[in-house]
Amino acid sequence: MEYWIAALLLLNGLVVAQETSGLSLRTHIALPNVDGRMDHLSVDIKGQRLFSSALGNNTVEVIDLQSGKRVRTLPGLAEPQGLFFDASTNRLYAANGVDGSTRIFDGATFQLLDTVKFSDDADNIRYDARSRSVIVGYGGEKGLRGRPQGSGALGILDSSGKLSREIVVDAHPESFQLEKTGTRVFANVPDKQEVQVADFVKGTILARWPTTVARTCFPMALDEAHHRLFIGCRAPARLLVIDTESGRTVASTEIVGDTDDLFYDAARSRIYVIGGQGFIDALQQKDPDHYERIAHYATPPGTRTGLFVPEWGKLFAAVPHRGEQRSEILEYDAK
């Protein structure tokens, strides 16, 4: 009897630990009349605004986080994917999959200021604060879209929004991350089943790291302090941890399926993985080579993109409209 009581108390303790660690759902933000798949997000820290790509709706949704309401819809886009709000210029960049354009909007009036035309499939966007450059991944082979073989690239826009140069990769680049203290950029190239490493300044490819443990590498996050790169794979669904000094895979752990966004929370040594299978995973970094899944939060199916805002300790996840399931943004507090 004492054994069973002890076991029950231990089980209860584990359940409580999972409920009180990781993430806490704070609120739902409704997005009425938004149909189809959702894609990536960006944030205006000072203005407390969230921007969400509604790919299937061909719109960008503007959300006031103080009121918890959508305040504007930007129509007429062409499957918007990546977004970036540049606080230094008060401009919003929106990358479009269908026509390859990146459209630049005034962050106050949302007037279209400029359009940068890439060859095809403008996707993820990143920012390099040192050079004040906006980087757009685009083009190339992409098996999921049935597109032909060809090179992809990272297009680098200067502070005025003009294309200044490109870094060519072997196929379509999915998620990519830049070092803040170094000069390397890491890019997932799933149609080649590898991570390609480039010198951001010289524009040359330095290395190609095969993702042999798992394939179809899409989201990525970087722990620069510990020289660790986190890769979200879909076939099978696993998180790969790569040593950025050697290119060696040092850890592999099971994660939610159909992931399209993952984030590293440096303050809590934690990784959040958003998957369309219908869960958000929280994994604790025990040390640079060891990771434990501490929580597995249920979400509406198809919720696979989001944004972690370290300044606020918040994670946002984008829910698509499917049947009776309405489009919305889930807001979580990291604990």
Positions of predicted regions on the chain:
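Predominantly soluble domains enriched in secretory-pathway, periplasmic, or organellar proteins
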Residues: A17-K335
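Bacterial N-terminal signal peptides
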Residues: E2-G13
